[in-house]
Amino acid sequence: MATPIDVVIMAAGKGTRMKSALPKVLHQLGGRALLAHVIDCAARLSARQAVVIAGHGAADVEAACAHLTRAAGDARQDLSLKFARQEPQLGTGHAVQQALPLLADDGVTLVLSGDVPLTQPATLRALLEQCDGQRLALLTLNMADPTGYGRIVRAGTQATAQASSQVRAIVEHKDATEAQRGIHEIYSGIMAVPTRLLRGWIHRLDNKNVQSEYYLTDIVKFAVADGVAVVAHQITDAAQVAGVNSPVQLAELERVYQLRQATALMEQGVRLADPARFDVRGTLQCGQDVEIDVNCVFAGQVSLGEGVRIGANCVIANATIAAGAVIHPFTHIDGEKLGVQVGEGALIGPFARLRPGAQLGAEVHIGNFVEVKNSTLAKGAKANHLAYLGDATVGERVNYGAGSITANYDGANKHRTVIEADVHIGSNCVLVAPVTIGQGGTVGGGSTITKDTPPGALSVARGKQVSLPNWKRPVKVSKG
């Protein structure tokens, strides 16, 4: 039977260098909180539970965890999420001590950092294999500039780090000697340790160090003293253990994350004009032969069908775009809670806006400066320029003229407009809801329609044209 995994996530830090009132672990990377990435990673390990240790902004952190965006199909729904508070913050060892009452001795405790979002589940599985329920396993990395990191001190010499030699200690940078500071192998902040051993070692910690803190890393010397093997799983991918302590570091890690998203999509066959000018802030699923131009942002849950083409500078959130659709440049699609559906072969934009609840059928055309909100457009309907469709049901092959709008709001409530199949709406019309335009009807340009119109009828509602011959324009009066 596999040893149960209990994950402890360090999320108590203030993040002073972020210069923000928002707790550091709630700052976003790829459209999701740093902490959300870590929790999802824990879930993909099939962990029994995750204990989030909160401190600074604890109430905000705990509340946010209930609303963190889930990746499609992830296992987080099966992860038991619990909380412990570290008040005051007296070091990493003190932090883990707050979680101990929630941990059972039959498991392995995996310690992660809430501000280290790019660690991969495969890396942690390898670390857990090294632990094997009986060893203290550390995730380490060789760094050209290890300043600020705890150094891995191995048997034999303190100035070198041979991967084959026994780990003897972790020395924090501020407590390290000059010789120890010459070591380039660093501790990532991630470890796996049998909980029954961790419990005893935590209670032996003291704060006799430069920072007067209880270091979790001191358990290494206790393990050595007790004859417990201390092993290191060394990786080469620095981004997997990179933490966020400032807006600069957050921006740097964002670009790493986005490039990895872009690379994964291109390996699936997606054609990106420039992977350096592409952002995914949620999840993006693409069919075969999808093309995406530069400076596009995808947020929430977005699905692109086969052969979809996305023009430059588009923002698309929470939308499903069917095969063969073309989204021209500068289009904004935001499905929010209701979602947006774009049918096969539809043409959208440029400069179009699709708002929540827009449901567009096959071969629908939505042109420049057209806004659609909470409306259904059937196959072949067209609104090619300068128009608004809100709370409307539009039939097949409708042509909706430039400058026309549905007046859907009476100051208190929204009302629906129904435009039946094969209707032609002239330019600059106002359809005052609730109203129905009968099948095959025509509304003359400039009309304000307030009553239902019968099928096949021409409906015109506008003031009579008056022309005054020999009209003299007013002359501007000279002042002084």
Swiss-Prot record:
* Pathway the protein acts in: Nucleotide-sugar biosynthesis; UDP-N-acetyl-alpha-D-glucosamine biosynthesis; N-acetyl-alpha-D-glucosamine 1-phosphate from alpha-D-glucosamine 6-phosphate (route II): step 2/2; Nucleotide-sugar biosynthesis; UDP-N-acetyl-alpha-D-glucosamine biosynthesis; UDP-N-acetyl-alpha-D-glucosamine from N-acetyl-alpha-D-glucosamine 1-phosphate: step 1/1; Bacterial outer membrane biogenesis; LPS lipid A biosynthesis
Q: Name one GO biological process term.
A: cell morphogenesis
Q: What is this protein called?
A: Bifunctional protein GlmU
Q: What class of enzyme is it?
A: transferase
Q: Which PANTHER family match?
A: BIFUNCTIONAL PROTEIN GLMU, NUCLEOTIDYL TRANSFERASE
- Role description: Catalyzes the last two sequential reactions in the de novo biosynthetic pathway for UDP-N-acetylglucosamine (UDP-GlcNAc). The C-terminal domain catalyzes the transfer of acetyl group from acetyl coenzyme A to glucosamine-1-phosphate (GlcN-1-P) to produce N-acetylglucosamine-1-phosphate (GlcNAc-1-P), which is converted into UDP-GlcNAc by the transfer of uridine 5-monophosphate (from uridine 5-triphosphate), a reaction catalyzed by the N-terminal domain.
Residues recorded as binding Mg(2+), renumbered to this chain, are 115, 245
Query: What does the record's cofactor remark say about binding?
Result: Binds 1 Mg(2+) ion per subunit.
Taxonomic lineage of this organism?
Answer: Bacteria, Pseudomonadati, Pseudomonadota, Betaproteobacteria, Burkholderiales
Give the protein family: In the N-terminal section; belongs to the N-acetylglucosamine-1-phosphate uridyltransferase family.
Q: Which cofactor does it need?
A: Mg(2+)
